């Protein structure tokens, strides 16, 4: 009787789906072009296909979300990561086939193994969302981030009905760029659902945390950082004839932000006048004498060039091969898609509908999330559109868990990968921030093995090291074929033996002892329930991923603005308190010989100015 109860437990935990989703075998991906060339250890177990949502808040809904799930063969991971790309309207197949998935696509449109795949550390599920993105389809395009979040919760309910064992894995939500809006909204919706007596999700779901890369979380801070970024990276001539126009646009953006009341009914995700700063900067810095494909700075990686006005829209360079791969009939069939299905990286229609006239920027809900779960924000330092300056200034001003920003005495810690300093990390009160060196808007695209180190930091899978008298942390280096982990090159190898799989589809793994192992698994599952309760209550308090010994105590807190600090010697700009940002801009204006019609000063946010403010979707895809 006990045996029967244990076997039925995963099914009881997930509420019945009103839709016939079939079985896991119906979604199994058995072959792909080039897969036979990979070693057995490099071939993941894969499931993919469309899940119908039947959204309750949409009449006659026909929305279907496409997912692609990867896990290591014969290995039962304790963690599962759901990954979302941004846009809005950009497919998560970017993440699956150009960033952190187990494959990259070669010029023959065949899969090759991705040496740094996150699938070595966790199961990973890539989801095209909202409807109309990538392979996902709909005739009912969503208009608010709250709707996007509710739609994803419905998708998860369908998914966990199909994969009930995944409910008991530690759930992490990850994404990049515009997913900086998606992820916080979805996290909030998941939390609300789990607390509701009528929620769609199983109560056993353990929400571990989130990772957001180059996130477009605070559009205002990002917009105000563009000009500073161009100046600091010497991408622009501060004495150029176009500078007064750029400064005027910066001032207009600042005034719009200052006049915003901050109330949900009047807030907007972004202002077109603020987005115009980046567009103008790219236009003014165009090199018309250069070859056509070198005339514009790549907004996703300032070290690269592109045609104008694309300015990075034709990047990454592997995109044509990915597109051709996903249009192959054999691939569509393997992914359980109709032969007439079409794929494009980004959908303008999704972005044009997602107006967010009611939804507030996700930075406003970030503090509440940080009370519940740890979140890692990471930024590649070559990105312009969602640059590290904007993210760091957002954190400086963010009030969370009893304080503003990271407190004085909380220091950046150097991060080493394979004895190379690849970034710096700071962590406190459930928030961790990582600046990743020599990386673009898509950090995993530039160096996937290093990006997996972000997951190791998130999993507390690192150790304290010292290289050349510099103390820091080091993340593992993985040897895939031998399934061995290195903490650093001087430490002995740590053997990670394969574990039995938790999936209920024996054909997926070809394990002849599967059913015996499964019986053992469900028994262990009951014990894990006790562990879950312990983790839930022990992790409820905000904490720092980094050890306390990296933090220096200080009685006094003093916050300085780093705005234009590289120019201080030339422009005679003093470090200024956060509350006086505008006075710093005023000094910059004066140093350029530019005088505004009115003094540039902070405006009363409560002032009822009659402003013609109109929000539109990003003119450039955030991928």
Swiss-Prot record:
Catalytic residues at 177, 383, 441
The residue range of the signal peptide is 1-16
> TM spans, by residue?
513-533
Q: Tell me its EC number(s), please.
A: 3.4.16.6
Q: Name one GO molecular function term.
A: serine-type carboxypeptidase activity
Per the record, the major location class is Golgi
> Which EC class does it fall in?
hydrolase
Q: Where does it localize?
A: Golgi apparatus, trans-Golgi network membrane
Query: Residue ranges, Lumenal compartment?
Result: 17-512
For region Disordered, the annotated ranges are: 597-623
Q: Note the Pfam families from the entry.
A: Peptidase_S10
Q: How does it sit in the membrane?
A: Single-pass type I membrane protein
Question: Which residues does the annotation flag as glycosylated?
Answer: 54, 258, 430, 438, 469, 483
Q: Catalyses which reaction? A: Preferential release of a C-terminal arginine or lysine residue
Q: Name one GO cellular component term.
A: trans-Golgi network
GO biological process terms, alphabetically, are: apoptotic process; proteolysis
Residue ranges that the UniProt entry lists as topological domain Cytoplasmic: 534-623
Which InterPro entries does the record associate with it? Answer: AB_hydrolase_fold, Peptidase_S10, Ser_caboxypep_ser_AS
Please state which protein family the record places this protein in: Belongs to the peptidase S10 family.
Outline what the protein does: Protease with a carboxypeptidase B-like function involved in the C-terminal processing of the lysine and arginine residues from protein precursors. Promotes cell fusion and is involved in the programmed cell death.
Under which name does UniProt file this protein?
Answer: Pheromone-processing carboxypeptidase KEX1
């Amino acid at each position: 009787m006990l045996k029967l109860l244990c076997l039925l437990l995963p099914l009881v935990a997930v509420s019945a789906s009103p839709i016939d989703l079939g079985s896991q075998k119906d979604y199994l991906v058995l072959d792909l072009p080039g897969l036979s060339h990979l070693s057995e250890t490099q071939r993941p177990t894969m499931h993919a296909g469309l899940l119908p949502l039947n959204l309750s808040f949409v009449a006659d809904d026909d929305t279907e979300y496409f997912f692609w799930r990867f896990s290591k063969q014969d290995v039962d991971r304790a963690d599962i990561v759901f990954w979302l790309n941004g846009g809005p309207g950009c497919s998560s197949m970017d993440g699956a086939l150009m960033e952190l998935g187990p494959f990259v696509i070669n010029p023959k449109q065949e899969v090759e193994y991705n040496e740094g795949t996150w699938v070595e550390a966790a199961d990973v599920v890539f989801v095209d969302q909202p409807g109309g993105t990538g392979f996902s389809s709909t005739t009912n395009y969503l208009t608010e981030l709250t709707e996007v979040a509710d739609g994803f919760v419905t998708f998860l309910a369908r998914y966990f009905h199909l994969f009930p064992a995944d409910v008991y894995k530690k759930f992490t939500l990850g994404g990049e760029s515009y997913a900086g809006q998606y992820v916080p909204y979805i996290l909030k919706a998941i939390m609300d659902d789990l607390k509701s007596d009528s929620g769609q999700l199983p109560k056993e779901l353990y929400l571990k945390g989130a990772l957001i890369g180059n996130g477009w979380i605070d559009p205002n801070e990002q917009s105000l950082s563009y000009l500073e970024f161009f100046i600091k990276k010497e991408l622009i001539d501060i004495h150029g004839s176009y500078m007064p126009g750029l400064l005027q646009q910066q001032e207009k953006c600042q005034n719009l932000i200052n006049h915003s009341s901050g109330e949900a009914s009047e807030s907007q995700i972004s202002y077109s006048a603020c987005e115009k700063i980046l567009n103008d900067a790219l236009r003014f810095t165009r090199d018309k004498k250069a070859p056509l494909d070198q005339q514009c700075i790549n907004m996703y990686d300032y070290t690269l060039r592109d045609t104008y006005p694309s300015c990075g829209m034709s990047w990454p360079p592997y995109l044509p091969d990915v597109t051709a791969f996903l249009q192959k009939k054999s691939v569509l069939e393997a992914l359980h898609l109709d032969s007439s299905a079409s794929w494009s990286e980004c959908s303008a229609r999704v972005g044009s509908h997602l107006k967010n006239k009611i939804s507030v920027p996700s930075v406003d809900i970030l503090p509440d999330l940080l009370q519940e779960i740890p979140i890692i924000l990471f930024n590649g330092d070559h990105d312009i559109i969602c640059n590290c300056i904007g993210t760091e200034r957002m954190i400086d001003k963010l009030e969370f868990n009893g304080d503003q920003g990271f407190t004085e005495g909380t220091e950046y810690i150097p991060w080493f990968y394979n004895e190379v300093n690849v970034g710096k990390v700071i962590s406190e009160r459930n928030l961790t921030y990582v600046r990743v060196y020599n990386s673009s808007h898509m950090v995993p695209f530039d160096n996937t093995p290093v990006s997996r180190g972000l997951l190791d930091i998130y999993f507390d899978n690192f150790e304290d090291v010292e290289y050349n008298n510099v103390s820091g942390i080091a993340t593992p280096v993985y040897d895939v074929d031998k399934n061995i982990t290195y903490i650093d090159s001087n430490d002995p190898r740590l053997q990670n033996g394969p574990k039995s799989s938790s999936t209920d589809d024996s054909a997926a793994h070809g394990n002849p002892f599967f059913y015996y192992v499964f019986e053992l698994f469900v028994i262990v599952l009951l014990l894990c329930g006790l562990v879950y309760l312990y983790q839930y209550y022990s992790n409820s308090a905000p904490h720092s991923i980094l050890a306390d010994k990296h933090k220096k105590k200080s009685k006094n807190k003093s916050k300085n603005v780093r705005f234009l600090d590289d120019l201080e010697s030339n422009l005679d700009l003093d470090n200024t308190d956060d509350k006086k940002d505008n006075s710093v801009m005023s000094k910059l204006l004066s140093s350029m010989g530019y005088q505004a019609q009115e003094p540039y000063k902070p405006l009363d946010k409560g002032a009822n100015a009659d402003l013609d403010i109109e929000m539109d979707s990003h003119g450039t895809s955030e991928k």
